[in-house]
């Protein structure tokens, strides 16, 4: 099973029982689909995997939720530390001078904290410090410039829920878990049944250092789902401060869609983080990434342009050898992913399983 955060004997036993049931159903069905999730770092691949667990497995156990609680605490602490550091670098002052001391206390106490130290609820002191800081207009001004530095997409969501998350009995909701940021390392497999098909989904780390592992997953792939973060058209890579993230995704997609390993493989493009893109495109023009773009500023026109740019990278389209099936997605929206994955499954059945006697 693709459970990254399971801990304890109960969770292990539970996972083994699910795996056994899936194998039994697979033996009865006889149809197996291998899905490979690829894309640059922070494109939303791991969130898609969590949605598959919610939609097609059994969600998350209490132990897993507790593990995610520590991740969420860490995300929030790291986000605030980043904002404090960047405020100094950008010369942004706290509107309330008392909050400068709050920032000093926060940084000195929690700069070196690790996930292992976050099994308990936020202390009252820490919660109050974060509330004070998040309420400061200077902090908000810095946050609004987050495209200039590396900050989790979930920062605003979590801090706007700080009262709830600070409760001693806090247990992450489904939405909280979907927004948790965990860097993918290695290869994580998630198995599930859907429409009488046994799916094996592989999530592979998207950072440059992780991509050398991709080749080990290429054999026998039924379909590739390539994730692109639409919202990153104006941002730089964490690993390369010069490289535009969208351009990096384009280069990566070019190398995948035209790869000899995938000549007979369905290629599905998820243009993800549509919700963030819709907000950002109102303020930041698309030609910051594509200088040649002369179209309008509407969400529809700009997103369709990005889709066309990626689809044109498919060099086999002109010979009718390979079609790229594109979908606009919001990986944190369960209803959206339910609808999109249903369409994806139909594509896979129609174009990749004809020889398996399904229809």
Curated annotation (Swiss-Prot):
InterPro entries: Gprotein_alpha_I (IPR001408), Gprotein_alpha_su (IPR001019), GproteinA_insert (IPR011025), P-loop_NTPase (IPR027417)
SUPFAM superfamilies, sorted: P-loop containing nucleoside triphosphate hydrolases (SSF52540), Transducin (alpha subunit), insertion domain (SSF47895)
Key words of the record: GTP-binding, Lipoprotein, Magnesium, Metal-binding, Myristate, Nucleotide-binding, Palmitate, Transducer
GO function term, MF aspect, one: G-protein beta/gamma-subunit complex binding
Region G1 motif, residue ranges: 34-47
One GO term describing the cellular component: cytoplasm
UniProt-listed PROSITE patterns: G_ALPHA
Keyword Disulfide bond: no
UniProt domain G-alpha: residue ranges: 31-359
Coiled-coil residue windows: none
Span list, region G5 motif: 329-334
Subunit structure comment from the entry: G proteins are composed of 3 units; alpha, beta and gamma. The alpha chain contains the guanine nucleotide binding site.
Protein name listed in UniProt: Guanine nucleotide-binding protein alpha-4 subunit
């Amino acid at each position: 099973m693709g459970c990254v955060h399971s801990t304890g004997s109960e969770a292990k036993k539970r996972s083994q029982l699910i795996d056994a049931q899936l194998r039994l159903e697979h033996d009865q069905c006889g149809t197996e689909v291998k899905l490979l999730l690829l894309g640059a770092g922070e494109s939303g691949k791991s969130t898609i995997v969590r949605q598959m667990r919610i939609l097609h497995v059994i969600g998350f156990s209490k132990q897993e939720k507790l593990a995610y609680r520590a991740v969420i605490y860490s995300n929030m602490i790291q986000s605030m530390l980043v904002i404090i550091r960047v405020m100094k670098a950008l010369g942004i002052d706290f509107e309330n001078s008392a909050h400068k001391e709050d920032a000093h206390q926060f940084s000195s106490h929690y700069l070196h904290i690790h996930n292992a130290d976050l099994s308990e609820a936020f202390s009252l002191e820490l919660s109050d410090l974060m509330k004070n800081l998040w309420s400061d207009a200077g902090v908000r001004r810095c946050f609004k410039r987050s495209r200039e530095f590396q900050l989790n997409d979930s920062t605003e969501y979590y801090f706007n829920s700080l009262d709830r998350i600070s409760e001693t009995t806090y247990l992450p909701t489904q939405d909280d878990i979907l927004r948790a940021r965990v860097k993918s390392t290695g290869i994580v497999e998630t198995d599930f049944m859907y429409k009488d098909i046994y799916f094996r989904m592989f999530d592979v780390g998207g950072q440059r250092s992780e991509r050398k592992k991709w080749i080990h997953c290429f054999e026998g792939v039924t379909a590739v789902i390539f994730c692109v973060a639409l919202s990153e058209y104006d941002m730089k890579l964490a690993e390369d401060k010069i490289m535009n993230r969208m351009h990096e995704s384009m280069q990566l997609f070019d190398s995948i869609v035209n790869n000899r390993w995938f000549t007979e493989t369905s290629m599905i493009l998820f243009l993800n983080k549509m919700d963030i893109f819709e907000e950002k495109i109102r303020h930041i023009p698309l030609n910051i990434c594509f200088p040649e773009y002369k179209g309008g500023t509407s969400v529809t026109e700009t997103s369709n342009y990005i889709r066309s740019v990626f689809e044109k990278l498919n060099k086999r389209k002109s010979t009718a050898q390979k079609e790229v099936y594109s979908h606009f997605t919001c990986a944190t929206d369960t209803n959206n992913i339910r609808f999109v994955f249903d369409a994806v499954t139909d594509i896979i059945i129609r174009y990749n399983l004809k020889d398996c006697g399904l229809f």
